[in-house]
Amino acid sequence: MRMTRDGKEHEYKKGLWTVEEDKILMDYVRTHGQGHWNRIAKKTGLKRCGKSCRLRWMNYLSPNVNRGNFTDQEEDLIIRLHKLLGNRWSLIAKRVPGRTDNQVKNYWNTHLSKKLGLGDHSTAVKAACGVESPPSMALITTTSSSHQEISGGKNSTLRFDTLVDESKLKPKSKLVHATPTDVEVAATVPNLFDTFWVLEDDFELSSLTMMDFTNGYCL
């Protein structure tokens, strides 16, 4: 029962359509065209709501609907479209001329799914993905392994915390870019000569040469 704008209540019929109701609907559409489905009950006396009239026309009474058996070409097209679009029947039906979304859906559920061996959708998904452990068991395993890692590394963590605390107590040394003194440079010069493969007897440096080399090294 539905309330109209004028305040009157209309009780619409539900269930199967009769031959007389189909004839009334077909005559109305031939005369007035498709659309304005809610006006049919007022103008024809048909005790059906606008939605029911629209679905009845589009799925059964329209001359554009192919009510024959599905061909092999249509089956192949529906299967390929279903792989791309899934259960979006309205989009699939638009690409299958003469078929409605209701026809395509019913034909898939009653014929094609069984033909492809899919059966129940949930069963097919489990078969494709394989048997997996329950999420709860995986969570328990992960938690246990994490606990062992934490327990095993407890001592190292404590030692790291101790080092961090000790580092906080030590004053931070400031980096100072100071120029090395002559004494420091002279102390490092012998180490430089150790890298040269030269005999002391064959090569001697005078004090002046030593100072020149030192000055050049500093620069």
Curated annotation (Swiss-Prot):
Domain of life, per lineage: Eukaryota
Subcellular location(s) of the protein: Nucleus
Listed CDD domains: SANT (cd00167)
Annotated keywords: Activator, Developmental protein, DNA-binding, Nucleus, Repeat, Transcription, Transcription regulation
Cellular component annotations (GO), alphabetically ordered: nucleus
Major localization listed first in the record, in broad terms: nucleus
Gene Ontology biological process terms in this record: regulation of DNA-templated transcription; root epidermal cell differentiation; trichome branching; trichome differentiation
Tissues with expression: Expressed in roots, seed coats, leaves, stems and flowers. Detected specifically in trichomes, and in the cell division and differentiation zone of the root.
Molecular function GO terms recorded: DNA-binding transcription factor activity; transcription cis-regulatory region binding
Domain HTH myb-type: 9-61, 62-116
DNA-binding region boundaries: 37-61, 89-112
Summary of the function given for this chain in its UniProt record: Transcription activator, when associated with BHLH2/EGL3/MYC146 or BHLH12/MYC1. Regulates the epidermal cell fate specification. Mediates the formation of columellae and accumulation of mucilages on seed coats. Controls the elongation of epidermal cells positively in roots but negatively in stems, leading to the promotion of primary roots elongation and repression of leaves and stems elongation, respectively. Ovoids ectopic root-hair formation, probably by inducing GL2 in roots. Controls trichome initiation and branching.
Protein name in the entry: Transcription factor MYB23
Organism of origin: Arabidopsis thaliana
Gene behind the chain: MYB23
